[in-house]
Regions:
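Bacterial N-terminal signal peptides
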Residues: 8-19, 23
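PEST-like low-complexity, intrinsically disordered acidic/proline/serine-rich tracts
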Residues: 2-3, 25-252
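N-terminal low-hydrophobic presequence detector
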Residues: 1-5, 9
Length: 252
């Protein structure tokens, strides 16, 4: 009788433990909320970066002369627009920022500052033209009036590691639409409001301690381009923002 009573008491005492374990097991089996894009970032792109111009000097560091359209796959309609380029007219019309839109802004020399606007939106501010770009993960901004920076939809691209190992890294892909017509170069080489800008942001760490950001930009435009216009822009990580000096747009 004593043995049976002891067994019953033991079962009763163990019941809360078993019940608690079951609740823990059930909770562990429940689907967990997906991490935010900020928490899931495979690479840190935040900070101040300064553009390092090592190629296309004649089109980036100075305003090229009218008619210098080399390497851009322009349609006849694009050439007609570019041949009529008039920076004074653009300034008078309030369109001095035509060369500072999403199709070309990463090619304009200067610094950029990347921060998180919130857990689902990366923000890029530029010294040149004092522009702000918002890269939204998951859902693009609601359709509205076309703008210089348009509407940008972002997604992380994860690089695979070895089997069973965590991801080795990754990059950022951004697709921008909803653009206001602008210039690919300051001498009037145009892109239309139908253009689609696809960008890839890759960060690299060099053995000497330097950190680089390489932005590959692909512009597609059924109106003004015969093919894809692809460029790569290089930025070096800056220690801080002490040299940050935003400047207004200039048409020439």
């Amino acid at each position: 009788m004593r043995t049976r009573a002891a067994f019953v008491i033991g079962v009763l005492l163990a019941a809360p433990v078993v019940s608690g374990f079951s609740r823990t097991l059930i909770a562990a089996q429940q689907p967990q909320p997906a991490p935010t894009p900020r928490a899931a970032a495979p690479v840190d792109l935040t900070g101040y970066w300064i553009s390092i111009v090592t190629e296309d000097w004649r089109w980036r560091m100075v305003t090229p002369p009218k008619g210098d359209y080399a390497s851009v796959p322009m349609t006849p309609a694009a050439r007609k627009v570019a041949d009529g380029w008039d920076p004074k007219r653009d300034t008078a019309a309030g369109e001095a920022c035509r060369a500072y839109g999403a199709g070309a802004i990463m090619r304009v020399p200067g610094r950029i500052h990347i921060t998180w606007e919130n857990d689902t939106t990366l923000r890029v501010d530029t010294e040149a033209g004092t522009q702000t770009r918002l890269f939204r993960f998951g859902t693009a901004a609601p359709a509205g009036e076309p703008s210089w920076q348009g509407r940008s939809l972002a997604q992380w691209q994860i690089s695979g590691g070895r089997r069973g190992a965590p991801p080795a890294g990754g990059s950022l892909k951004v697709v921008t639409t909803g653009l206001r017509a602008g210039y690919l170069r300051k001498n009037g080489v145009p892109y239309s409001a139908n253009a689609i800008v696809t960008e890839y942001y890759n960060r690299t760490n060099e053995p000497n301690g330097d950190t680089w950001l390489v932005v590959t930009t692909v512009v597609e435009d059924p109106v003004y381009l015969n093919g894809r216009f692809v460029t790569s822009s290089h930025f070096k990580k800056a220690a801080d923002g002490s040299a940050w000096k935003p400047t207004p747009c200039e048409a020439s």
